Amino acid sequence: MTGPAIELRRMVLDDLDLVRRWLAEPEVARWFLAGSTIEDELSDLERAVNGQEPTEVLLASWGRRPVGWCQWYRCSDYPDHAVGLGARPEDVGIDYAIGEPLDRGRGVGTALVATLVAHIRRLHPGVGVVADPEASNAASRRVLERNAFVLLDERVVVSEPDGKVMAIYRRPPEAR
């Protein structure tokens, strides 16, 4: 990816219409709506934006143009999911999506995850970061591997709604 850096800002309720459009994109829906619906995802995001969930949701922009969103959470706030992942209590989990079709396959996802990890580490130095894309999501796996995440396992995660095999990655605290 060349050009400006990824910028992150807290998502606001007005951003949900844009996220709705992105969730309707087949390539986003394929991975982000597994076992869920657009309305379910938007409801979860709205609760997080309103502070009713312990997840920070961020809008990602590239050159001041929104390109996707991401979120992070302390694994200890979601203990069932943390146990399912095999995450450590002090770990932080992440999710991310590139919503704009023209921005996929150009390094934007790699830059987004790098920016998100840097954001998390500014707030919580020394934490491990975990992610669990579907095992068949080769693009997401490449993004994580390019960001020094290490594959821990591939298996069904009970707390995931659709019963698919997930690739569980962790970026250790010392990875820069």
Protein language model features and the residues they cover:
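Conserved GNAT acetyl-CoA-binding A-motif
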Residues: 122-132
